[in-house]
Amino acid sequence: SVQVSSYIPGRIRLYSKRLIGNAGLCRQVYTYISSYHEIDSVEVNVVTGSVLIKYQPGLLRTNHELAKVEQYVVKHIERR
């Protein structure tokens, strides 16, 4: 499972225990997310299982699929 740890427009941090110690899966996640030209940068940490995604909100929202993902993230962020 994936938890949405933090969100501000232009920056999303996710966590997944499945990524911890799994370099192959981390590479797959990095490759998939970074394949979208609307994404500025992706950092996947194999030690912590975190994924940091940076993007320009206006550009990202021109892609209908990514706009839906952002809406999902907003609805599922962990409230602290």
Feature map (PLM): residue ranges:
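Short glycine-/aliphatic-rich beta-strand segments at the starts of folded cytosolic domains
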Residues: 1-22
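Short acidic amphipathic segments
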Residues: 1-2, 14, 29-50, 54
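Functionally constrained cores in energy, signaling, and assembly domains
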Residues: 5, 16, 36, 65-68
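Helix N-cap motif at beta-to-alpha junctions
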Residues: 19, 56-60
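Ser/Thr-Pro-rich, acidic low-complexity intrinsically disordered regions of eukaryotic RNA-binding
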Residues: 22-28
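Charge-rich, low-aromatic oligomerization/scaffolding segments with amphipathic character
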Residues: 59-76
